[in-house]
């Protein structure tokens, strides 16, 4: 079933492969204590050793700024340390948040 789901995802998104998927979500407590998390799936299964929590340096309640910071920090490190790049990045948020967070750095 996992393989079927991955094949459907590949087909719908017109991707060659989806072996590594990285997903991001932001959170805060009453507009403070901003944090963002990244979960990773490899071949459709959680890769908990690759999960990351990002403490946000900006203390404003700003989802766009938070996502920009996290995407920059994550993929700067991927490029700098020659880490495995994801086949698919999923961001929890609207189209504007995805555009603002990803398109600027990719």
For each predicted feature, which ranges?
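Acidic, glycine-enriched active-site microenvironments
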Residues: 1-106
């Amino acid at each position: 079933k996992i393989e079927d789901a991955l094949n459907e995802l590949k087909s719908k998104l017109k991707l060659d492969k989806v072996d590594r998927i990285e997903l991001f979500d932001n959170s805060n407590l009453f507009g403070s204590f901003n944090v963002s998390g990244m979960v990773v799936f490899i071949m459709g299964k959680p890769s908990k050793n690759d999960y990351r929590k990002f403490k946000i340096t900006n203390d404003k309640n700003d989802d766009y700024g938070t996502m920009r910071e996290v995407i920059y920090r994550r993929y700067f490190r991927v490029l700098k340390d020659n880490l495995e790049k994801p086949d698919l990045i999923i961001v929890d948020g609207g189209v504007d948040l995805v555009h603002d967070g990803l398109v600027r750095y990719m």
